[in-house]
Amino acid sequence: MAFLGLFSLLVLQSMATGATFPEEAIADLSVNMYNRLRATGEDENILFSPLSIALAMGMMELGAQGSTQKEIRHSMGYDSLKNGEEFSFLKEFSNMVTAKESQYVMKIANSLFVQNGFHVNEEFLQMMKKYFNAAVNHVDFSQNVAVANYINKWVENNTNNLVKDLVSPRDFDAATYLALINAVYFKGNWKSQFRPENTRTFSFTKDDESEVQIPMMYQQGEFYYGEFSDGSNEAGGIYQVLEIPYEGDEISMMLVLSRQEVPLATLEPLVKAQLVEEWANSVKKQKVEVYLPRFTVEQEIDLKDVLKALGITEIFIKDANLTGLSDNKEIFLSKAIHKSFLEVNEEGSEAAAVSGMIAISRMAVLYPQVIVDHPFFFLIRNRRTGTILFMGRVMHPETMNTSGHDFEEL
């Protein structure tokens, strides 16, 4: 099973106090954000949800007017749509990925936290409910400890109590009027699960050539696989793409792995929305030997600089036009925090203790081997629509608790 939770915080303060939309727009947003994040964090893990960010920015657009709204629409790739048409698309897409009949679970929960006594336009509240199913809560931000506890409890309740301490009291003060919280929860079983008894301790070699010991899962099975050229002569100029579906085949994790001799940084500049589509269209179902780390990645991102780099700047200054949200013309967005957590394992959040190990060989085989023992790029996507739900990379896999497992080193 793989579990992924994604959580976003947007805080508003007062100074005086191909594919078609939305898939195409989200694909472009995904790649642009990824490139910005890798430029500012050379050797760090990356994890974010472009879907979550698109929904959060849709909420901000609902409250924006004039040049502020125009800037958001342009940066999000909505220029080809009629004004406001994007909200219907976002609502339909959100409803599709959270459908109860799906074989995976994906919940998107939104809430607007409002300072007691502060006026928010009724039409804005109605539109928030209509398009984003967003609730509204009144709080006293001057009581920052109580507010932080309240919001953290809300996040826990909407993520099966798996994520705690999203915000801290220092995120709020008496000048804070509004906080917009967006939480996404995803959980899915692999279509072909990894057997826990096949997991072994394995060396993961980082780009600086240091090594860390991690639990390495293993299975042979039929997966979507392809080899692609990176245009260089290093290590044959070939990299691997493996797509592992979740139950139901609608959602999958796509792994992109350079040859071990080639740092991931050499491959990353190639990543474009069109290339992601090419990978999806070119991989073929075949038998593959897969060695995949059992790992967790957790990351908190300050979205303010990232969004500014993408062209969204006005919402962060005192001249922001958010009069669709409130008649208070002094209001602007002061903080944007995006926190994500990813856990990938054999079959669940707690793998069963086992004994009786099965030997695993790295000798010659008749079909491809994908040995994920060095940094890799990944995304989680809807295979039917092509929509990217999550994107990231693993440079430093954090070892999960292996207590109770009799691992044997390969």
Swiss-Prot record:
Serine protease inhibitor that inhibits plasminogen activators and plasmin but not thrombin. May be involved in the formation or reorganization of synaptic connections as well as for synaptic plasticity in the adult nervous system. May protect neurons from cell damage by tissue-type plasminogen activator. One of its GO terms (biological process) is central nervous system development. It comes from Homo sapiens (Human). The keyword Secreted applies. Changing S49P: In FENIB; Syracuse; decreased protein stability; decreased proteinase inhibitor activity; increased tendency to form polymers. SUPFAM superfamilies: Serpins. This is Neuroserpin. PROSITE patterns: SERPIN. Changing V163I: Increases protein stability and decreases tendency to form polymers. No effect on inhibitory activity. InterPro entries: Serpin_CS (IPR023795), Serpin_dom (IPR023796), Serpin_fam (IPR000215), Serpin_sf (IPR036186), Serpin_sf_1 (IPR042178), Serpin_sf_2 (IPR042185). The gene is SERPINI1.
